[in-house]
Amino acid sequence: MWPNLFWGFDAYDGSNFNAFPIYFPTEFMQTEPRDQSSCQQLSMEQATEPSMNPDQEDIVEGGENYGELSNQQETVPSFENADQNLSRLEMSTLARELKEKVKQSRALRQSVNNAAEQQPSTKPQPVQQEVQDLINDILKSQDQDDNLKNPSKLTGPQDDTETEKPASTLPTTPRTIKESPLSTYSIPVYCPASPEGRTHIPDEILDNAPKGPRHTHRGQVQMFCNGECGRRETDKAMPAIEPSDKTEETEGATAVRIPPVATDGDLEQDVIMWLRHTGFYDKAKRTDALARWKQLAKMEQGLARPQQDHQEAGVALASASQGSKEAGMGTRPGPDADCPPVCRPEQGGPGSSQAALSCKSKQSTDIQRATLAETRGGSLRDRAANQQPSKKSDRGRCARRHRSSSPRGRSGSHKSRRATTDSPVSRSTTKSTPSRARQPGHRDYREYRDDRNRDTKPRSPLVSCRAAVAFNPGVKGAPLVRQRFRPRQTNTDLQHKARIVGAPPRDMESNIKERQNHDPERQSGQFGIRWLCTSPLALQNTKSLRNSFDDLKPVLLGRDGQEMDDYCGRDLLRLMDASERGLHRP
């Protein structure tokens, strides 16, 4: 039992630690460098004792100082001499120096009261530099051996290197956005730049178009447009749907004509629908897809039709009741009283020379717009927009009708916002705001507008965005300022527009200085939307910004999803231009 208990590890369960000899912990578990260093010092002394006759007593005294250590290290074999291959002569000289250091440090060790027992084991005795270097070398070699023998020390750094590899070396799958099927099959997208707003589909990549790129019925290769056309315009005017029927009839034909239908925004569904439609699936499975296409087209056309009615009604209403304050939109250019007030001069236009011409052309354009709408996509209206460059023609009208409290109120962005609302659509809604209630944008912000309908005084136009305030530096006089206001219209129709441009929604009567540098919160985030396009010359590029005929469907502008409920076209561009100039003026 005795050998098993003390030295036979088969009988030791690890709990009876006191049964071992007192020197067990240091003898079997001595891995710390402090014990090794003291052991090395002692072994050097013991190894060199025979050759140190004159100073033998002092070394013995030094050995007594190491009493507790020498007891523990009786059985530890001293490998230091073998490891370092030190000759007897070197050891004797080193031991002599060590003896002197021991004498010097004896007083120091005795002075320390409680740490006296621990000091020999916690740190090596102060020896000369060579001895310490020797000991350090031995310790380093032993530590390296321990590192080789210790699996935990081995695996530790390896794990670190495995977990902390640079990302480039790791075999991670690249985080790429899942590529849409557009890379292989482009989806029918309403493209205003292509002829008649038809969809553009690169048929060179189609499996079922063996004769190369499809030609439109006009004989020109289908245009591919870049820019906004790449975006999915879900609220575009819906072109006619005959091509879908043709596709169903001529399924076996070589060139498949895709119906120019605007998709509803669901990319995968549209790809599947389009594949079904172009003959990748059998006819039985394609019928539901075709039905969905037709339903989409009917819905879109139905949405576009009321708007055209609004436009025609608006033209008639504006021309009939231009004298009335409500319908006249507050801008009667004196010479052309019969012209619908929609003829807004462009900012910085050449002059009033073209005022009458632009008004007349605009009136005829408004009447034609309903008929030309489906195929033109509002391009005719936008073109007519470029024909209205006069500023002075508007002055005579509202100067005699409206007075604005502030000379600044008629600044350009306000004018442009007026322009946004004079378009035929809003003209029908200006009388009172009945059809405006149907427009989602206004419905969303009704509370915000009613908030400010309290002050429907002539000063309300001052809510024009800070752009408005500083827009027309040359026009500071009261006669120009008073021209453009119908206070009711301003509160309802223009103020949400002012908010879109980044206007301070409230504080309408705050002085112009304050409005120029309004508190930054108003200008940041949802109130500080900056227009991407600042010039009315970019009409063709911004046509896709909004469907000109479908005013019932709002367009999301800006990060906050601010809805613009009047169609953009020319008027929105004027608004953008005015706001940009006003915002960036020093």
From Swiss-Prot:
Biased composition (Polar residues): 107-128, 169-181, 352-368, 421-436
Comp. bias regions, Basic residues: 398-418
Positions of region (Disordered): 98-128, 141-181, 301-464
GO molecular function: RNA binding
Biased composition (Basic and acidic residues): 441-458
InterPro entries: YTH_domain
Protein name: YTH domain-containing family protein 2
Function: Specifically recognizes and binds N6-methyladenosine (m6A)-containing mRNAs, and regulates their stability. M6A is a modification present at internal sites of mRNAs and some non-coding RNAs and plays a role in mRNA stability and processing. Plays a role in pathogenicity towards plant host.
Disruption phenotype: Does not seem to affect growth but produces fewer conidiophores, as well as fewer spores on each conidiophore. Displays milder disease lesions on rice leaves.
Family label: Belongs to the YTHDF family. YTHDF1 subfamily.
YTH domain span: 435-576
